[in-house]
Amino acid sequence: MPEYLKMEKQDLINEFEAVRKEYEALRSLHLSLDMSRGKPGFDNMDLSEKMFDLVGNDTGFKNIDGIDCRNYGGLDGLIEMKNLFAEILELNPEQIIVGGNSSLNMMFDTIAQAMTHGMGGAPWYECKERKFLCPVPGYDRHFAIAQYFGFKLIPIAMNAEGPDMDAIEEWIKDETVKGIWCVPKYSNPNGITYSDAVVKRMAALKPAARDFRIFWDDAYAVHHLYDTKDELLNIYDECVKCGNPDLPIIFTSSSKITFPGAGVAAQAASPNNVSMLKGRMQYQTIGPDKLNQLRHARMFRNIQDVEKHMKKLADKLRPKFDAVLFELDIQLKGLGVASWTKPNGGYFISLDVLEGCAKRVTELCANAGMTLTPAGATYPYGIDPKDSNIRIAPSFPSVDEITKAAKVLCVAVKYAALEKIINN
């Protein structure tokens, strides 16, 4: 099949009629498919069920320090979990704060604290024109937090190495720019891992705002899909080399390692930032869920245990990614109306369709019984200026369901592209 944009009008009409019939046939199946969020499938979560047997009357409730995890206390988490997250993030345990089940919650709280009490400076609410840098396409819930707190969201284009550092270095000359969101490894949604050059330039930033912070969400630190594993330079070490130890606030969690609703989250930072954050936390909580932390600590004694577990998860997840990529290659390659990422890890595939077609594609999919992340969600304010990006989340459905969903998606992409080309 030649590229659609190079075809004669009548050939396009004929192709559209064939695609329309294929689409109507799929609609008649009354499918109910969901690729809207990066939720682990039941098969992935089942691999962690054994942890519920690791804490109880038979196994005891005390950690290695003799702390009874049923009781109050332990503001910044159990030492076992600090050690584990320190291994994952390649930091010192003293730099780790272990929280509840949600790293997003910790991000929200950190910004809320900065709004009222500053981040080593004046409270952020005093800056009326405050701005936050948002690499795009990116994570909608990051953008939503900054928007909730009244920041103007500044899109920063992503490229093959990470965010556009030239643009970032220009924007941080403005002292009203207070931070940047980063998903540096297997980024959401395009699966890019920041290059060494990008990490080094990020660490060397000299913002006009001394309270500028890098919100480094290392959500997919150990989430490899294939034997080819991306490597990410240590942002904290690089910041220390550049005299910027306080610049990054690092987040991660076990949400997509064990249970999204009952994992363990952590944040990490310089000793100065950790002291500041813990000083504020003491007014917020007496401590996190230590029993859940103990369950995780007993299941994962070290990074090697995590890596073995993640290989099992990858074995479950990989066929789902492969099924989507296979359909994209078979149905859309060479048509000139779509491009997509082939990530080595993470939870998403980023699909770019013909400009002006993303909303129509998601509409067509919805009408055929398939739910996708809303078009535009990967951009601030839900507005994709090109209306072209769609985030694909293959993790939750079964391989059979994923294959059906990918077929619907590909037909919808062709339908929307032909419709637009013919009408123009």
Feature annotation, model-predicted:
Residues 67-210, 221-243, 408-410, 414-423:
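Conserved core of the PLP fold type I
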Residues 361-367, 405-410:
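Short amphipathic alpha-helices in soluble, non-transmembrane regions
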